[in-house]
């Protein structure tokens, strides 16, 4: 009966709507109305942004975010744009969006939408902007998107899109912006994309791309920015053709598993930004001159040799040269020579951990706005005082972040006058009359791929550009940028205030001007210098204009006769539709009704995570309860200080490990989400990946990838049938060291693990090691200005036997504390002994054996045959790591390189191949691969010292 009443109600409402149209001059096409109603049903609107979508006619009633235009051919109004940016919407994209045949802009950016992208969007052949960034969309990109022949901007970054790139996207011949970064897209970039001749910006960083780096991309004549960081290409070289892309402004291939030499880039005459760091590049830095526009050269974490070219000193705009962690030597050129640095300019030269043995006197006296870092070079050996000591000092290890600004501009005597800041007013600096107080419109925008490392020299010219006649066409004093901040990528967030023009009568924009400014930014009309790259709107802060109703102009141009005809047709259409609905209900009511259970998760939805969450899924309690058989004892696979760990089976066959916090380990919700945010940014093949979380029903759980071969502690246990070969032990040691190196040098902020031990080194199905149990409590401390301190003074939760002995004296933790713990693990790998057992100390036992010339007597006999040279060098490295004096211990990068050298001594036929999990006789959750003389092998080359994955997510973006 209730359902019958609903149908009758609908009929009455429809009839009323149709009759009310007799007084109207405008009406939305019924197909568009129906489509938007379906869209609304698929969405959840917790903040009621779409409350006016309950009105009858979308265009006539000015539905929020809906912009319409008349179509003279049928006399109806049609939906032209759908702007639903940053409205905290959840739910899914309705397939019925494909019915909005006149749609040109579809903008759902920075919401929390889930589900897949409907293939029906391929029907929107008039679409020019497809903007879906910053949601939680999953699945593959539909092939049907290749039918969007008029598309200019394809922006689906910061989602969870997987699968391969469809070749059909090569049909988007008008496309200018291809933004698919920060997803989980796999496979190779289709070479067919080289036919996208109008693409300016190709951003695919932080995905899971493999295969070759296509040389065909160099055939894109309009290409300005190519950014593919964080890919895992198959050890390919950088194509030489990339050095001849005529308009290339930025080339960013950081951490892409690239090999070979650096190509000649001298033909890239407008190149501003080069980042090919964290690869396996070899040879020398090319001597050919870079573009005079170059601001940033990042070559760090490679295998480069030779010297720094002398012509680097002739680069007038250079802001940052990073060549640390290579094998460079020779004379260091004075980069700032023949250059006058302005007060707002800054130059950073990071030369750490190379082979430089001498420096010139000029280099020892850099200007105040030049930073030189020499730590870890031979020239720094035994330096205790003087200017060289300053360049070699520990302070040069600080993480140097690009400049961030939050300025307070002096207003002089204006403070004596009244300007109600609390009411979103502010002084307009530089206005024709002093102390002009006005209400600005706030625009939060982000430069997606800027081609510089320091914004300050560009700030004034950027504001002038935005104000210029080709853009907003306002006075320069009407624009202010008093806050900007760098985010991972790197990307640049800024808050721009736009003030009304000076007037004695008014200090606010009228609604028409507010609408013009909003339209200007929302339709990507801003035209600026190529070095700034593409931009996106994060949010629009209306401030004092919250009560302003922004009316979108709609001129139907319909005659009364046409309107009446449309109304009569619409009434007939809706009456037929209503009759069909009644017939359907009567038939349906005769069927047996099925009761449906109320979903508890709808009553207790997942709390909204922080704005900058990335690549992790929020699970509800029911999902994890079902996956773990109600957290049964049979599902439990471990227990730690955080709580119990369960093996879970999620729909689709995904096997996970669920860490369930015990009562004493629960955090505040803010702290819990902060930890998730940090962990979600950490991506390295030797770190256990966080897949999701749950914060429901008083529970806090973390969902990780499942490691079927258990831990290193399991593999070293005497309970297991088959021992580990030396080659496999070295491989595990090397992978573990690489994971720790990433935490120390590439995590943002850097992390000290504090509890490295065999049980926290897990083994996947191919026996690849993954470091586990690192979290927010282990962050390297930052001072008030965001600068890294060289130690942490929190209470240690480490395990006895692995804790740095220096800590008990200084109560300080440093990266060298992790080095000590890892050294103990190395000794366990070599000897099979526990760190402390029956009064015996592993460090003391090993040192005594080595001093007596009996090193081999403590080697684990289950290792089988092995190379004594490899064992000796491995043991020497382990002992160096376990020195009581932290200064005597090597840095993690040195450890990785030495292990690579030792592993290189292992004959190819003895190296372990990547095998499937081998079940142990002792446990169903652990197993290991064993090198056998009769086995079929492939060389283990999955890791390099420089395969580091940088963080990818914005730290301010609304997520």
Swiss-Prot record:
Give the intrachain disulfide bonds.
none
Q: Does the keyword Cell inner membrane apply?
A: no
**Localization (cell):** Membrane
Pfam families named in the record: LRR_1, LRR_8, LRRNT_2, Pkinase
Leading EC class? transferase
Q: Which residues lie on this side of the membrane: Cytoplasmic?
A: 587-959
Check the record and name the InterPro entries matching this protein: Kinase-like_dom_sf, Leu-rich_rpt, LRR_dom_sf, LRR_N_plant-typ, Prot_kinase_dom, Protein_kinase_ATP_BS, Ser/Thr_kinase_AS
- What PROSITE patterns does the database record attribute to this sequence? PROTEIN_KINASE_ATP (PS00107), PROTEIN_KINASE_DOM (PS50011), PROTEIN_KINASE_ST (PS00108)
Residues reported to bind ATP: 637-645, 659
Question: Sugar-bearing residues?
Answer: 62, 88, 102, 123, 182, 293, 311, 327, 358, 369, 510
* GO MF terms, alphabetically ordered: ATP binding; protein serine kinase activity; protein serine/threonine kinase activity
Write out the entry's keywords from A to Z.
ATP-binding, Glycoprotein, Kinase, Leucine-rich repeat, Membrane, Nucleotide-binding, Receptor, Repeat, Serine/threonine-protein kinase, Signal, Transferase, Transmembrane, Transmembrane helix
Signal peptide stretch:
1-24
EC number(s) recorded for this UniProt protein? 2.7.11.1
Enumerate the catalysed reactions.
L-seryl-[protein] + ATP = O-phospho-L-seryl-[protein] + ADP + H(+); L-threonyl-[protein] + ATP = O-phospho-L-threonyl-[protein] + ADP + H(+)
- What residue intervals traverse the membrane? 566-586
Which parts of the chain does the record assign to the membrane side Extracellular?
25-565
Q: Which residues does UniProt mark as catalytic? A: 755 (proton acceptor)
Report each LRR repeat as a residue range. 79-100, 101-124, 125-148, 149-172, 173-198, 200-220, 221-244, 246-268, 269-292, 294-314, 315-338, 341-366
Task: State a GO cellular component annotated for this protein.
Answer: membrane
Topological category with respect to the lipid bilayer: Single-pass type I membrane protein
- State the family named in the UniProt similarity comment for this chain: Belongs to the protein kinase superfamily. Ser/Thr protein kinase family.
Query: What protein am I looking at?
Result: Probable LRR receptor-like serine/threonine-protein kinase At5g37450
Q: Please tell me the species this chain comes from.
A: Arabidopsis thaliana (Mouse-ear cress)
């Amino acid at each position: 009966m209730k359902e019958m009443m609903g149908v009758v109600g609908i009929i009455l409402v429809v009839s009323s709507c149709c009759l009310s149209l007799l007084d109207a001059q405008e009406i939305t096409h019924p197909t568009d109305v129906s489509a938007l109603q379906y869209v609304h049903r698929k969405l959840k609107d917790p903040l009621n942004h779409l409350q006016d979508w309950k009105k009858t006619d979308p265009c006539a009633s000015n539905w929020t975010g809906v912009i319409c235009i008349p179509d003279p051919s049928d006399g109806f109004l049609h939906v032209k744009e759908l702007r639903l940016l940053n409205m905290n919407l959840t739910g899914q994209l309705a397939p019925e969006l494909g019915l909005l045949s006149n749609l040109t802009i579809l903008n759902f950016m920075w919401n929390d939408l889930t589900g897949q992208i409907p293939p029906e969007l391929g029907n929107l052949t008039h679409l020019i902007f497809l903007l879906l960034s910053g949601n939680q969309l999953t699945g593959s990109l539909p092939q049907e998107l290749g039918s969007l022949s008029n598309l200019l901007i394809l922006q689906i970054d910061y989602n969870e899109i997987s699968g391969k790139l469809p070749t059909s996207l090569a049909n988007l011949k008008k496309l200018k912006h291809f933004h698919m970064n920060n997803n989980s897209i796999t496979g190779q970039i289709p070479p067919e994309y080289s036919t996208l001749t109008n693409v300016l910006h190709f951003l695919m960083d932080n995905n899971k791309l493999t295969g070759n780096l296509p040389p065909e991309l160099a055939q894109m004549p309009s290409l300005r920015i190519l950014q593919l960081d964080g890919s895992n290409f198959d050890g390919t070289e950088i194509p030489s053709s990339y050095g001849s892309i005529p308009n290339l402004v930025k080339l960013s291939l950081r951490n892409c598993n690239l090999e070979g030499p650096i190509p000649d880039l001298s033909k890239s005459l407008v190149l501003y930004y080069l980042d090919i760091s964290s690869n396996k590049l070899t040879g020398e830095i090319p001597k050919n001159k870079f573009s005079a526009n170059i601001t940033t050269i990042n070559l760090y974490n490679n295998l480069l040799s030779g010297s720094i070219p002398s012509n680097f000193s002739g680069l007038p705009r250079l802001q940052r040269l990073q060549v640390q962690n290579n094998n460079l030597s020779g004379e260091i050129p004075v980069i700032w020579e023949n250059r006058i640095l302005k007060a707002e300019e800054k130059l950073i030269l990071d030369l750490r951990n190379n082979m430089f043995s001498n420096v010139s006197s000029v280099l020892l006296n850099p200007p105040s706005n030049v930073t030189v870092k020499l730590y870890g070079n031979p020239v720094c050996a035994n330096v205790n005082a003087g200017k060289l000591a300053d360049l070699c000092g520990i302070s040069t290890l600080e993480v140097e972040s690009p400049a961030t600004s939050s300025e307070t501009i002096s207003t002089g005597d204006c403070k004596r006058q009244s300007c109600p800041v609390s009411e979103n007013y502010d002084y307009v600096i530089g206005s024709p009359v002093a102390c002009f107080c006005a209400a600005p419109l706030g625009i939060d925008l982000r430069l997606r791929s800027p081609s510089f490392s320091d914004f300050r020299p560009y700030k004034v010219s950027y504001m002038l550009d935005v104000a210029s006649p080709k853009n907003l066409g306002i006075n320069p004093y009407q624009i202010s940028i008093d806050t900007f901040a760098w985010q991972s990528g790197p990307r640049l967030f800024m808050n721009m205030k736009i003030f009304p023009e000076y007037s004695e009568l008014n200090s606010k924009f009228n609604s028409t001007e507010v609408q013009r400014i909003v339209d200007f930014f929302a339709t990507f009309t801003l035209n600026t210098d190529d070095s700034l790259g593409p931009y996106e709107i994060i949010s629009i802060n209306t401030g004092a204009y919250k009560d302003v109703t922004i009316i979108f102009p709609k001129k139907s141009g319909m005659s009364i006769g046409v309107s009446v005809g449309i109304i009569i047709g619409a009434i007939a259409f809706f009456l037929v539709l209503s009759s069909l609905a009644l017939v359907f209900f009567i038939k349906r009511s005769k069927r047996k009704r099925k009761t449906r259970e109320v979903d508890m998760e709808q009553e207790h939805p997942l709390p909204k995570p922080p704005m900058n969450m990335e690549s992790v899924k929020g699970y509800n309690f029911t999902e994890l309860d079902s996956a773990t058989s109600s957290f049964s004892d049979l599902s439990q696979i471990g227990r730690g200080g955080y709580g119990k760990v369960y093996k879970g089976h999620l729909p689709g066959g995904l096997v996970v490990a669920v860490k369930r916090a015990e009562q004493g380990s629960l955090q505040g919700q803010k702290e819990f989400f902060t930890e998730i945010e940090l962990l979600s940014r950490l991506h390295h093949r030797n770190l256990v990946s966080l897949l999701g979380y749950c914060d429901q029903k008083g529970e806090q759980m973390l969902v990780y990838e499942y490691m079927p071969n258990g831990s290193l502690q399991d593999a070293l246990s005497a309970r297991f049938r088959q021992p580990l070969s030396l080659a496999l032990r070295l491989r595990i040691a090397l992978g573990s060291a690489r994971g720790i190196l990433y935490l120390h040098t590439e995590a943002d902020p850097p992390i000290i693990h504090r509890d490295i031990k065999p049980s926290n080194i897990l083994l996947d199905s191919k026996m690849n090691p993954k470091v586990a149990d690192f979290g927010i409590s282990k962050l390297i401390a930052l001072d008030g200005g965001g600068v890294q301190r060289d130690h942490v003074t929190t209470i240690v939760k480490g395990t006895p036997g692995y804790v740095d002995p220096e800590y008990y004296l200084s109560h300080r933790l440093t990266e060298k504390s992790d080095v000590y713990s890892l050294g103990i693990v190395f000794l366990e790998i070599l000897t099979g002994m526990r760190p402390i057992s029956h009064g015996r100390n592993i460090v003391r036992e090993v040192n005594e054996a080595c001093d007596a010339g009996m090193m081999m007597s403590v080697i684990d006999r289950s290792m089988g045959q092995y190379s004594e040279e490899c064992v000796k060098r491995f043991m020497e490295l382990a002992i160096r790591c376990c020195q009581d004096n932290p200064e005597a211990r090597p840095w993690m990068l040195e450890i990785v390189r030495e292990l690579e050298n030792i592993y290189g001594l292992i004959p190819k036929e003895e190296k372990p191949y990547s095998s499937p999990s081998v079940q142990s006789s002792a446990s169903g959750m652990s197993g290991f691969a064993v090198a056998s003389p009769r086995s079929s092998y492939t060389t283990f080359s999955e890791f390099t010292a420089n395969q580091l994955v940088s963080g990818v997510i914005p730290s301010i973006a609304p997520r």
